[in-house]
């Protein structure tokens, strides 16, 4: 394997996605999990699934042996077309990791909760004892009822998981609101994405993507701002890189280098926190120089005149000292 002609792997642009392993026709390259088994892979079944790591929705084939995932390969789905990133291909071993909880544990009586206690994940039974599900649920419910009775329902709160489905999120908030009788329910998405959901709904009518990311392969210009697909959505980033290599104009707007700027024709490294100033300056130029489809704007938008008046003072000259561009 040659990485960037002669660069060592760690210094090259290799992202360890394992595509070379999946494509290798001679089995000269095989996953470590297979190599540890003398290069032989005898599986009980192959299960079709979807990678849980990010929102791209890559379809995968899980090769299962003795109820453990022995190997993962990309499936030709609409989002990934058989591609996977390093997490999707090599990061599924957590499923059978020995640090995972397989039975309920209850803290041993007399062992206090203090930051000084260092729980050994290889031997949690120093601080906890195994319990049945019935005992654990009864124990938890009793503690919840005690807190409710002594300090009120608002002393309780629930925090949902981004790994759950929409249906699971709905059931979770219903449990907190109707069972715990409190509105103290939250979720990481509320902090990260709620503002963008509201803004996207108001501006374009949809709070989700309106086209598959693979469509970037048919785009002339791609603008990436406020996103780090290289780390957060690596398979999506691979299609963006392909598009740029095939002639698409890639514009990356970000105060932090994330690797995608290496493929960009323009990289705007603005001052952190000055996104709005930069975008208003771009709006100013687009409107003042009439670089927009007037017929479309008149037919499909509202409030354009007010926007035009609002951004008149946000000229590039005025915004440049703020955003550093």
Where do the PLM segments sit?
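N-terminal export/assembly segments and adjacent metallocofactor-ligating motifs
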Residues: 1-289
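Short helix-loop capping/hinge segments that flank enzyme active sites or metal/cofactor-binding pockets
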Residues: 290-304
